[in-house]
Amino acid sequence: MENGEKAAETVVVGNYVEMEKDGKALDIKSKLSDMFWHGGSAYDAWFSCASNQVAQVLLTLPYSFSQLGMLSGILFQLFYGILGSWTAYLISILYVEYRTRKEREKVNFRNHVIQWFEVLDGLLGKHWRNVGLAFNCTFLLFGSVIQLIACASNIYYINDNLDKRTWTYIFGACCATTVFIPSFHNYRIWSFLGLLMTTYTAWYLTIASILHGQVEGVKHSGPSKLVLYFTGATNILYTFGGHAVTVEIMHAMWKPQKFKSIYLFATLYVLTLTLPSASAVYWAFGDLLLNHSNAFALLPKNLYRDFAVVLMLIHQFITFGFACTPLYFVWEKLIGMHECRSMCKRAAARLPVVIPIWFLAIIFPFFGPINSTVGSLLVSFTVYIIPALAHIFTFRSSAARENAVEQPPRFLGRWTGAFTINAFIVVWVFIVGFGFGGWASMINFVHQIDTFGLFTKCYQCPPPVMVSPPPISHPHFNHTHGL
């Protein structure tokens, strides 16, 4: 077994070559560039996973707690954190299996980024590829939309002179600059800074809520309605389903086989941010959060809050790049530009991908409810059901299990234990996440459309203050003047 793993490691060490280097082998002349730009270590992968996972959901989790109640909110975070870590592990196993098989066949991945749909194609055939491609691309499309909506929602709490739709136009143009980032190999400094930013924001939410104290007459009535309960649960499912970019992150690593437990450790860190912040904000504001899906809306405006807003804006730009970069790769492959040596040509070719994202963010600016809808309809399949089923079908034969590059952990019961966990995930997520969650999220989403309408200029903005006109002055007549 050890010899097999060493052989696999030798094969999978990889031939990753930077695409922005005009096809030349990676030759880093500048130590500064090496430090900030070229990342491929296990630490880089950990920062990427943790930074990408927590994103803007940090601001909507208190809203989910108001729908679920404190106890259910905490339990669902722990539960979906475990499930998400397991399916990320499955994706990493399938990637290593696929890449090992291909490199044993002397396939060269120079200037080519392996993606999830290609793993499914190589292991299970074109039908799996098509299903995986459809779900993955749709999820990443709406994941990018959510980041754009979050940018507009957050900046409004600093500058409300412009409505949220106008801010969406502005940040759509800003986020389009991510077309110049070649791959996940180049997110080293951004991932590091992104995690620092969300760490500050999480602890700001926690400390500010505790110092603020409970509002007068605070109520914690959740869970009050079944629809709200499953809507909140699917937002948490979405929170820990951020591993749709796992394959791309792994491919950027120098030793992808080291990824196996990285997502688990990233999740453990993320829980130290999400549990205290969501609990503290819900404790302080209670049911008020039901009508304020962004936690910033209820906290007093001061320098600390404004700083947190700015940091989250920068982080959402980074997360937009995380979600959109795999879409850039798919589009490049579709139009035959993926292996182009000119980064400028590839950047120009990527721009059409941003246009539908921009448009959808303007149509559906429902910050909060859209997370649950995407979670139930897309995340449930993309990062939970499909990876679990793919693992079962890839290793369904005894020969495939015997020749597998990576064996399941012994403490989980090897193949029997792994398949049992996979089956449980498929059934649970399909019934609870997609079934009940989809029903609840769609009802809530339609309610937002009925209440605010499509293309709404300023979702959940306070009504404008009506300034009363000055009193009309009447001329004073001296009735005794003519007497």
Swiss-Prot record:
Any one GO molecular function term: symporter activity
GO CC terms in record: plasma membrane
InterPro entries: AA_transpt_TM
Short name of any one Pfam family annotated for the protein: Aa_trans
Regions of this protein lying in the Extracellular compartment: 72-73, 152-166, 212-226, 283-306, 372-374, 444-483
Cytoplasmic side: 1-53, 95-130, 188-190, 248-261, 328-350, 396-422
Glycosylation sites: 291, 478
Organism: Arabidopsis thaliana (Mouse-ear cress)
Protein name in the entry: Auxin transporter-like protein 2
Positions of transmembrane segments: 54-71, 74-94, 131-151, 167-187, 191-211, 227-247, 262-282, 307-327, 351-371, 375-395, 423-443
Gene that this polypeptide is encoded by: LAX2
Key words, A-Z: Amino-acid transport, Auxin signaling pathway, Cell membrane, Glycoprotein, Membrane, Symport, Transmembrane, Transmembrane helix, Transport
Protein localization: Cell membrane
Its membrane topology: Multi-pass membrane protein
UniProt signal peptide: none
Chief site of localization: membrane
UniProt GO BP: amino acid transport; auxin-activated signaling pathway; cotyledon vascular tissue pattern formation; response to nematode; root cap development
Domain of life: Eukaryota
Family: Belongs to the amino acid/polyamine transporter 2 family. Amino acid/auxin permease (AAAP) (TC 2.A.18.1) subfamily.
